[in-house]
């Protein structure tokens, strides 16, 4: 019998958007063009055209003891070449940003190999070999996962995800890494992800707009689609909460099942 992944519960558009993000067979809509050179500038790990720094020789040149797991798992290109590990970190506004931290974590783990990801309330970091990171970052920035106004590339001083948007719909950024170009109607980055000034601004394109964000967001909100309106999602969350509360704190809830498992009838 074949198994089809369900990814996440829910019957609303929010749940469907989450499933699209996680489903590797779903192709993200490309919404903007960011050159490789501009992306490297915003990441701030190396200069455009600079070689990748390495932390060990290419795997083909190294001697290893026999390891069946290593033989079974194909290394990603950066690992093959010994390239160092680097990161990109996003902050997502709670005002209907396309993605949010837990959605990002699940999406990264379903879609990409060789990743390490960390989830906090208002930011999400993805770490991997720098060579592979740039390719993944390009997809994350050029597609529907990213909105220049409500998604921020922030390697440090990430605060702002829960603050009100400004008059141009931009999420607050204490380091002012990006500004709104009123002539073009575009968001442009004037600093890299840790706040170092760029020689030239990087154009990230036009903000998506409030109506479009409400359609594609993965965030439940009372003023859009409330989680209370998603019966299946609530049911699953309540089941998990009940099981963790009653079972996790003991209270003899699962004692009969435990005795059976231990063979003590």
UniProtKB/Swiss-Prot annotation:
Taxonomic classification: Archaea, Methanobacteriati, Methanobacteriota, Methanomada group, Methanobacteria
Keyword Transferase carried by entry: yes
EC number, as in UniProt: 2.8.4.1
Cofactor: coenzyme F430
One Gene Ontology MF term: coenzyme-B sulfoethylthiotransferase activity
GO biological process, one term: methanogenesis
Pathway info: One-carbon metabolism; methyl-coenzyme M reduction; methane from methyl-coenzyme M: step 1/1
Family: Belongs to the methyl-coenzyme M reductase gamma subunit family.
Cofactor note: Binds 2 coenzyme F430 non-covalently per MCR complex. Coenzyme F430 is a yellow nickel porphinoid.
Record-listed coenzyme M binding positions: 123
Record has rRNA-binding as a keyword: no
Sorted UniProt keywords: Methanogenesis, Transferase
UniProt-recorded name of the protein: Methyl-coenzyme M reductase II subunit gamma
Subunit note: MCR is a hexamer of two alpha, two beta, and two gamma chains, forming a dimer of heterotrimers.
Job of this protein: Component of the methyl-coenzyme M reductase (MCR) I that catalyzes the reductive cleavage of methyl-coenzyme M (CoM-S-CH3 or 2-(methylthio)ethanesulfonate) using coenzyme B (CoB or 7-mercaptoheptanoylthreonine phosphate) as reductant which results in the production of methane and the mixed heterodisulfide of CoB and CoM (CoM-S-S-CoB). This is the final step in methanogenesis.
The species this protein was found in: Methanothermobacter marburgensis (strain ATCC BAA-927 / DSM 2133 / JCM 14651 / NBRC 100331 / OCM 82 / Marburg)
Catalytic activity reported: coenzyme B + methyl-coenzyme M = methane + coenzyme M-coenzyme B heterodisulfide
């Amino acid at each position: 019998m074949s198994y089809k992944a369900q990814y996440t519960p829910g019957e609303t558009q929010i749940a469907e958007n989450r499933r699209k993000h996680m489903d590797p067979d779903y192709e993200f809509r490309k919404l903007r063009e960011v050159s490789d050179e501009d992306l490297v500038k915003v990441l701030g790990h190396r200069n455009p055209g600079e070689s990748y720094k390495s932390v060990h020789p290419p795997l083909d040149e190294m001697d290893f003891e026999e390891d069946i797991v290593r033989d079974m798992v194909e290394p990603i290109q950066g690992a093959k070449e010994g390239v160092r590990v680097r990161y990109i970190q996003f902050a997502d506004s709670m005002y209907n940003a396309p993605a949010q931290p837990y959605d990002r974590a699940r999406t990264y783990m379903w879609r990409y190999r060789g990743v390490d990801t960390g989830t906090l309330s208002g930011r999400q970091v993805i770490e991997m070999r720098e060579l592979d990171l740039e390719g993944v970052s390009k997809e994350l920035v050029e597609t529907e996962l990213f909105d220049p106004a409500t998604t921020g590339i922030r390697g440090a001083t990430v605060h702002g995800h829960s603050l009100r948007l400004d008059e141009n719909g931009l999420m607050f950024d204490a380091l002012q890494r990006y500004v709104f170009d009123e002539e073009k109607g575009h968001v442009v980055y004037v600093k890299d992800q840790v706040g170092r000034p760029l020689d030239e601004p990087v154009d990230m394109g036009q903000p998506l707009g409030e109506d479009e964000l409400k359609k594609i967001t993965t965030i439940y909100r009372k003023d859009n689609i409330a989680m209370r309106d998603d019966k299946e999602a609530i049911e699953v969350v309540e089941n998990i909460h009940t099981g963790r509360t009653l079972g996790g704190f003991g209270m003899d809830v699962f004692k009969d099942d435990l005795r059976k498992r231990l063979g003590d009838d």
